Amino acid sequence: MRLSVCLLLLTLALCCYRANAVVCQALGSEITGFLLAGKPVFKFQLAKFKAPLEAVAAKMEVKKCVDTMAYEKRVLITKTLGKIAEKCDR
């Protein structure tokens, strides 16, 4: 439960910052992939950011923890983040 709250707060901070309230499409798809995609698909998604290997490895390590959450809860988090992003885009 704590991880989902942290993820939600981080997304709110990134998506709804006053200087730029429009959610970047790449960020939205990355967060959705982080929560719902399988490891190979998510790793491919991360490749477009050209992040250092250490950063990718760290992200994949956190994804292991997220993947232990029930799929239904991850879908619920994704839907909630979608609603938040929708409000930020207005």
From Swiss-Prot:
Tissue expr: Expressed in lachrymal gland, thymus, kidney, testis, ovary and salivary gland.
Localization per Swiss-Prot or TrEMBL: Secreted
Gene Ontology CC terms: extracellular space
TM helices/strands, residue ranges: none
Keyword Signal: yes
Domain of life: Eukaryota
Protein keywords: Secreted, Signal
Entry annotated with the keyword Acyltransferase: no
Signal peptide boundaries: 1-21
Residue ranges that the Swiss-Prot or TrEMBL entry lists as coiled coil: none
Family: Belongs to the secretoglobin family. Lipophilin subfamily.
Complexes and interactors: Heterodimer of a lipophilin A and a lipophilin C (mammaglobin B) monomer associated head to head.
Role this protein plays: May bind androgens and other steroids, may also bind estramustine, a chemotherapeutic agent used for prostate cancer. May be under transcriptional regulation of steroid hormones.
Name the UniProt record assigns to this protein: Secretoglobin family 1D member 1
Lineage: Eukaryota, Metazoa, Chordata, Craniata, Vertebrata
